[in-house]
UniProtKB/Swiss-Prot annotation:
GO terms for biological process: protein insertion into membrane; protein transport. The chain crosses the membrane at residues 46-66, 123-143, 160-180, 201-221. Keywords: Cell membrane, Chaperone, Membrane, Protein transport, Transmembrane, Transmembrane helix, Transport. Required for the insertion and/or proper folding and/or complex formation of integral membrane proteins into the membrane. Involved in integration of membrane proteins that insert both dependently and independently of the Sec translocase complex, as well as at least some lipoproteins. Aids folding of multispanning membrane proteins. The keyword Repeat does not apply. Belongs to the OXA1/ALB3/YidC family. Type 1 subfamily. InterPro entries: Membr_insert_YidC_N (IPR028053), YidC/ALB3/OXA1/COX18 (IPR001708), YidC/Oxa/ALB_C (IPR028055), YidC_ALB_C (IPR047196). One of its GO terms (cellular component) is plasma membrane. CDD domains: 5TM_YidC_Alb3. The gene is yidC. This is Membrane protein insertase YidC. One of its GO terms (molecular function) is membrane insertase activity. NCBIfam families: yidC_nterm, yidC_oxa1_cterm.
Amino acid sequence: SRTLIKSKLWVGPEIQKEMKLVAPNLDLTVDYGWLWFLSQPLFKLLTIINSIINNWGFSIILITFIMKIITYPLTKSQYVSMSKIRALQPKIKEIKEAFSDNKQRISQEMIILYKKEKINPLGGFLPVFIQMPVFLSLYYMLIGSVELRHAPFVLWIKDLSSQDPFYVLPIIMGLTMFFIQKTSSNNISDPIQKKIMNFMPVIFTVFFLWFPSGLVLYYIVSNLVTIIQQKFIFSNFKSN
Protein backbone atom coordinates (compact mmCIF):
# COMPACT_ATOMS: atom_id res chain seq x y z
CA SER A 1 0.00 0.00 0.00
CA ARG A 2 1.06 3.56 -0.59
CA THR A 3 0.44 6.63 1.55
CA LEU A 4 0.59 10.12 0.10
CA ILE A 5 2.07 12.67 2.45
CA LYS A 6 2.00 16.33 1.53
CA SER A 7 4.46 18.75 3.10
CA LYS A 8 6.11 22.07 2.41
CA LEU A 9 9.86 22.38 2.11
CA TRP A 10 11.77 25.63 2.42
CA VAL A 11 14.87 25.78 0.23
CA GLY A 12 16.64 29.12 0.26
CA PRO A 13 18.14 31.79 2.48
CA GLU A 14 16.66 32.16 5.97
CA ILE A 15 14.85 35.43 5.26
CA GLN A 16 12.47 35.48 8.19
CA LYS A 17 9.83 37.68 6.57
CA GLU A 18 9.43 35.18 3.71
CA MET A 19 9.66 32.12 5.97
CA LYS A 20 6.65 33.31 7.99
CA LEU A 21 4.53 33.18 4.83
CA VAL A 22 5.40 29.51 4.23
CA ALA A 23 4.43 28.20 7.67
CA PRO A 24 3.66 29.62 11.13
CA ASN A 25 6.77 29.97 13.31
CA LEU A 26 9.07 28.71 10.54
CA ASP A 27 11.13 31.86 11.13
CA LEU A 28 11.96 30.52 14.60
CA THR A 29 14.19 27.88 12.98
CA VAL A 30 16.83 30.58 12.44
CA ASP A 31 19.67 29.63 14.78
CA TYR A 32 20.37 32.45 17.23
CA GLY A 33 22.08 30.18 19.74
CA TRP A 34 21.03 29.66 23.34
CA LEU A 35 20.01 33.31 23.70
CA TRP A 36 17.41 33.09 20.92
CA PHE A 37 14.67 34.40 23.26
CA LEU A 38 16.59 37.71 23.42
CA SER A 39 17.93 37.70 19.85
CA GLN A 40 14.48 37.24 18.27
CA PRO A 41 12.90 40.43 19.72
CA LEU A 42 16.13 42.34 19.02
CA PHE A 43 15.94 41.28 15.36
CA LYS A 44 12.30 42.38 15.19
CA LEU A 45 13.30 45.77 16.61
CA LEU A 46 16.17 46.00 14.11
CA THR A 47 13.76 45.17 11.27
CA ILE A 48 11.32 47.88 12.39
CA ILE A 49 14.12 50.46 12.53
CA ASN A 50 15.38 49.40 9.09
CA SER A 51 11.88 49.70 7.61
CA ILE A 52 11.96 53.37 8.65
CA ILE A 53 15.52 54.44 7.75
CA ASN A 54 16.19 51.79 5.06
CA ASN A 55 19.84 51.16 5.94
CA TRP A 56 20.94 48.14 7.98
CA GLY A 57 24.16 49.88 9.05
CA PHE A 58 22.40 52.89 10.55
CA SER A 59 19.83 50.49 12.03
CA ILE A 60 22.66 48.69 13.86
CA ILE A 61 23.95 52.05 15.14
CA LEU A 62 20.50 53.06 16.39
CA ILE A 63 19.76 49.73 18.10
CA THR A 64 23.17 49.92 19.80
CA PHE A 65 22.27 53.36 21.17
CA ILE A 66 18.94 52.00 22.41
CA MET A 67 20.60 49.05 24.19
CA LYS A 68 23.23 51.29 25.79
CA ILE A 69 20.52 53.64 27.08
CA ILE A 70 18.55 50.71 28.52
CA THR A 71 21.63 49.28 30.26
CA TYR A 72 22.89 52.69 31.44
CA PRO A 73 21.84 52.19 35.10
CA LEU A 74 24.02 49.06 35.21
CA THR A 75 26.89 50.88 33.51
CA LYS A 76 26.60 53.74 35.97
CA SER A 77 26.66 51.34 38.92
CA GLN A 78 29.78 49.69 37.49
CA TYR A 79 31.75 52.92 36.99
CA VAL A 80 30.64 54.50 40.27
CA SER A 81 31.95 51.42 42.06
CA MET A 82 35.21 51.69 40.11
CA SER A 83 35.49 55.39 40.99
CA LYS A 84 35.02 54.69 44.68
CA ILE A 85 37.73 52.03 44.64
CA ARG A 86 40.03 54.39 42.74
CA ALA A 87 39.46 57.09 45.39
CA LEU A 88 40.49 54.59 48.08
CA GLN A 89 43.81 53.68 46.43
CA PRO A 90 45.93 55.82 48.83
CA LYS A 91 44.35 54.09 51.85
CA ILE A 92 44.69 50.67 50.23
CA LYS A 93 48.37 51.41 49.57
CA GLU A 94 48.85 52.36 53.24
CA ILE A 95 47.27 49.09 54.38
CA LYS A 96 49.49 47.03 52.06
CA GLU A 97 52.61 48.84 53.24
CA ALA A 98 51.67 48.56 56.92
CA PHE A 99 50.97 44.82 56.76
CA SER A 100 53.24 43.80 53.87
CA ASP A 101 54.31 40.62 55.69
CA ASN A 102 50.78 39.51 56.60
CA LYS A 103 48.45 38.85 53.64
CA GLN A 104 45.62 37.67 55.88
CA ARG A 105 45.71 40.94 57.83
CA ILE A 106 45.69 42.90 54.56
CA SER A 107 42.53 41.07 53.48
CA GLN A 108 40.88 41.74 56.85
CA GLU A 109 41.75 45.43 56.77
CA MET A 110 40.52 45.73 53.18
CA ILE A 111 37.16 44.19 54.14
CA ILE A 112 36.86 46.62 57.06
CA LEU A 113 37.70 49.54 54.76
CA TYR A 114 35.14 48.49 52.13
CA LYS A 115 32.45 48.08 54.81
CA LYS A 116 33.26 51.47 56.29
CA GLU A 117 33.04 53.18 52.89
CA LYS A 118 29.98 51.07 51.90
CA ILE A 119 31.69 49.63 48.83
CA ASN A 120 31.00 46.23 47.33
CA PRO A 121 34.31 45.06 45.75
CA LEU A 122 32.29 43.01 43.26
CA GLY A 123 30.06 45.97 42.44
CA GLY A 124 32.11 46.79 39.35
CA PHE A 125 31.83 43.26 37.94
CA LEU A 126 28.19 42.35 38.64
CA PRO A 127 26.71 44.85 36.11
CA VAL A 128 29.09 43.46 33.46
CA PHE A 129 27.79 39.92 34.00
CA ILE A 130 24.18 41.13 33.89
CA GLN A 131 24.78 43.01 30.62
CA MET A 132 26.68 40.14 29.00
CA PRO A 133 23.59 38.13 27.87
CA VAL A 134 22.13 41.25 26.23
CA PHE A 135 25.23 41.97 24.18
CA LEU A 136 25.84 38.29 23.39
CA SER A 137 22.29 38.07 22.04
CA LEU A 138 23.08 41.09 19.84
CA TYR A 139 26.18 39.26 18.64
CA TYR A 140 24.22 36.10 17.74
CA MET A 141 21.51 38.19 16.09
CA LEU A 142 23.98 40.07 13.88
CA ILE A 143 25.90 37.00 12.71
CA GLY A 144 22.77 34.88 12.28
CA SER A 145 20.60 37.28 10.26
CA VAL A 146 20.88 36.55 6.54
CA GLU A 147 19.15 39.88 5.85
CA LEU A 148 22.50 41.61 6.41
CA ARG A 149 24.17 39.72 3.56
CA HIS A 150 25.14 42.06 0.71
CA ALA A 151 23.57 44.93 2.67
CA PRO A 152 25.64 48.10 2.10
CA PHE A 153 26.38 50.72 4.74
CA VAL A 154 28.38 53.76 3.54
CA LEU A 155 31.52 54.42 1.49
CA TRP A 156 33.62 51.24 1.12
CA ILE A 157 31.35 49.00 3.25
CA LYS A 158 29.30 47.21 0.59
CA ASP A 159 28.41 44.10 2.60
CA LEU A 160 27.74 44.20 6.35
CA SER A 161 27.95 40.41 6.58
CA SER A 162 31.56 40.27 5.33
CA GLN A 163 34.81 41.63 6.74
CA ASP A 164 36.00 45.18 6.12
CA PRO A 165 38.19 44.87 2.97
CA PHE A 166 40.50 47.67 4.17
CA TYR A 167 40.44 46.75 7.92
CA VAL A 168 39.50 50.33 8.85
CA LEU A 169 36.62 49.37 11.15
CA PRO A 170 38.63 46.80 13.19
CA ILE A 171 41.41 49.37 13.73
CA ILE A 172 38.89 52.01 14.87
CA MET A 173 37.34 49.40 17.18
CA GLY A 174 40.79 48.63 18.62
CA LEU A 175 41.48 52.32 19.28
CA THR A 176 38.16 52.82 21.07
CA MET A 177 38.77 49.69 23.14
CA PHE A 178 42.29 50.88 24.01
CA PHE A 179 40.87 54.18 25.29
CA ILE A 180 38.34 52.33 27.48
CA GLN A 181 40.98 49.94 28.85
CA LYS A 182 43.37 52.83 29.53
CA THR A 183 40.75 54.55 31.67
CA SER A 184 39.64 51.36 33.42
CA SER A 185 43.18 50.12 34.13
CA ASN A 186 43.77 53.11 36.42
CA ASN A 187 41.87 51.13 39.05
CA ILE A 188 44.25 48.15 38.77
CA SER A 189 47.23 48.17 41.11
CA ASP A 190 48.86 44.96 39.85
CA PRO A 191 51.35 46.02 37.09
CA ILE A 192 51.21 42.63 35.34
CA GLN A 193 47.41 42.68 35.22
CA LYS A 194 47.52 46.27 33.98
CA LYS A 195 49.86 45.30 31.11
CA ILE A 196 47.56 42.43 30.15
CA MET A 197 44.56 44.78 30.13
CA ASN A 198 46.42 47.29 27.96
CA PHE A 199 47.39 44.54 25.51
CA MET A 200 43.84 43.20 25.14
CA PRO A 201 42.80 45.79 22.48
CA VAL A 202 45.62 44.55 20.24
CA ILE A 203 44.44 40.94 20.54
CA PHE A 204 40.81 41.89 19.90
CA THR A 205 41.77 44.02 16.89
CA VAL A 206 43.50 41.02 15.30
CA PHE A 207 40.44 38.82 15.91
CA PHE A 208 38.07 41.46 14.55
CA LEU A 209 39.98 41.74 11.25
CA TRP A 210 37.89 38.82 9.95
CA PHE A 211 34.61 39.61 11.72
CA PRO A 212 31.55 40.81 9.74
CA SER A 213 31.53 44.59 9.24
CA GLY A 214 28.09 44.88 10.86
CA LEU A 215 29.35 43.25 14.05
CA VAL A 216 32.47 45.44 14.16
CA LEU A 217 30.29 48.51 13.57
CA TYR A 218 28.17 47.53 16.56
CA TYR A 219 31.25 47.24 18.80
CA ILE A 220 32.62 50.61 17.62
CA VAL A 221 29.37 52.41 18.44
CA SER A 222 29.05 50.56 21.74
CA ASN A 223 32.62 51.53 22.70
CA LEU A 224 32.11 55.18 21.72
CA VAL A 225 28.97 55.40 23.86
CA THR A 226 30.85 53.69 26.71
CA ILE A 227 33.63 56.31 26.48
CA ILE A 228 31.08 59.13 26.70
CA GLN A 229 29.36 57.43 29.63
CA GLN A 230 32.72 56.93 31.36
CA LYS A 231 33.62 60.61 31.05
CA PHE A 232 30.18 61.72 32.26
CA ILE A 233 30.03 59.35 35.25
CA PHE A 234 33.64 59.92 36.37
CA SER A 235 33.32 63.72 36.11
CA ASN A 236 30.06 63.69 38.09
CA PHE A 237 31.66 61.49 40.75
CA LYS A 238 34.61 63.88 41.11
CA SER A 239 32.37 66.94 41.36
CA ASN A 240 30.24 65.27 44.04
